[in-house]
Amino acid sequence: MPLQGVDTQHFLDTCWQRKTTVLRAALADFVCPIDGDDLAGLACEEDVDSRLIVQEGQEWLLRHGPFGDADFGELPADKWTLLVQSVDQWIPEIASLLADFRFIPRWRIDDIMVSYASHGGSVGPHFDQY
């Protein structure tokens, strides 16, 4: 499934590693094979790298997995996000997404991280180290 409405050469020439870019509807035909419960299940596994970020007022709380069912039951109704790294290693349908990004050198792609956020959920101010 090619990226829809994306000129990959233009993206590489003007956007890649230069500016934040949102590719809306680029994967319009993609049907996600997992839901929030599936992602939470992965986050309970010992070998899966996962994080929960919860906003409490002006503070951001970070917790690292693995998590238990009780951890999800104790979450507030809103303002939290679950992040799970390397989902492509666990869900083949997610791994198939990498084919759509073959125009990016493979050595530049680490993994596919999947997030699930409640209403108002975010990762807060942060920077990524790769």
Residue locations for each model-derived region?
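Short hydrophobic/aromatic beta-strand or adjacent loop that forms the aromatic wall/cage
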Residues: T20
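Active-site region of the double-stranded beta-helix
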Residues: M1-V6, H10-T14, A28-C32, A40-Y130
